[in-house]
């Protein structure tokens, strides 16, 4: 059984929705067990509520130690000035012990994101996540152009060869489209298939 973790942080629900699509794609691959977990919130609850952040997310909170139990880890975070959120960075910064043991060497890693605008730093945010995974010796999987939704200019949409993505708009009113969710599913399935091949 190939074990896949979809690990995410979501402020307003966009990445939470994308995480579910990624998990759906991974589950479509026979012999795959998928867990969806989030990283801890760092914003005080009162501040988060006043900002309208989505706090009722059912996914359990992950621990750093459990990362070593998975064959693949797909990390999702919205952008903050062109990089991952402090919540996700704080979590990944605690993985030094795993790095020292080589606990994630050879496992599959991937990333997905959301931005407020079409040019809001999707690729740099993905790179900020992927850099961490590469330092752990993980085999990185993106979202290749074999996913047809990456091509075409008929609509404003997320999606890059470095990972699935969505555009939220400045007020968060835009929700992930079917093309963007399709990219998330495609990437999730590709990660699961790749991890299964590496496990032999």
From Swiss-Prot:
Residues the record lists as binding NAD(+): 12
EC number: 1.6.5.2
GO CC annotations, alphabetized: membrane
Molecular function via GO: flavin adenine dinucleotide binding; FMN binding; NAD binding; NADH:ubiquinone reductase (non-electrogenic) activity; NADP binding; NADPH dehydrogenase (quinone) activity
Domain Flavodoxin-like: 4-191
Cofactor: FMN
Binding, substrate: 99
Enzymatic reactions: a quinone + NADH + H(+) = a quinol + NAD(+); a quinone + NADPH + H(+) = a quinol + NADP(+)
Top EC class for this record: oxidoreductase
Manner of cofactor binding, per the entry note: Binds 1 FMN per monomer.
Highest taxon of the lineage: Bacteria
Keywords on record: Flavoprotein, FMN, NAD, NADP, Nucleotide-binding, Oxidoreductase
Binding site for FMN: 10-15, 79-81, 114-120, 135
PANTHER family reported for this sequence: FLAVODOXIN-RELATED PROTEIN WRBA-RELATED, FLAVOPROTEIN-LIKE PROTEIN YCP4-RELATED
HAMAP family for this protein: NQOR (MF_01017)
Family recorded in the similarity comment: Belongs to the WrbA family.
Name the UniProt record assigns to this protein: NAD(P)H dehydrogenase (quinone)
Organism: Rhodospirillum centenum (strain ATCC 51521 / SW)
Lineage start: Bacteria, Pseudomonadati, Pseudomonadota, Alphaproteobacteria, Rhodospirillales
């Amino acid at each position: 059984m190939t074990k896949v973790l979809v690990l995410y942080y979501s402020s307003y629900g966009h990445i939470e929705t994308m995480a579910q699509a990624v998990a759906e794609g991974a589950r479509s691959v026979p012999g795959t067990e998928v867990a969806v977990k989030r990283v801890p919130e760092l914003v005080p609850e009162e501040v988060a509520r006043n900002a309208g952040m989505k706090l009722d997310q059912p996914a359990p909170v992950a621990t750093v130690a459990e990362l070593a139990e998975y064959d693949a880890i797909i990390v999702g975070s919205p952008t903050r000035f062109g990089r991952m959120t402090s919540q996700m960075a704080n979590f990944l910064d605690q993985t030094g012990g795993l790095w020292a043991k080589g606990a994630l060497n050879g496992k599959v890693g991937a990333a997905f994101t959301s931005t407020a605008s079409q040019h809001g730093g999707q690729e740099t945010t993905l790179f900020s996540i992927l850099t961490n995974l590469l330092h752990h010796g993980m085999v990185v999987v993106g979202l290749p152009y074999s996913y047809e939704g990456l091509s075409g200019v008929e609509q404003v949409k997320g999606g890059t060869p470095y990972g699935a993505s969505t555009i939220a708009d400045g007020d968060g009113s835009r929700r992930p489209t079917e093309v963007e969710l399709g990219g998330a599913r495609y990437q999730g399935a590709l990660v699961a298939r790749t991890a299964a091949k590496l496990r032999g």
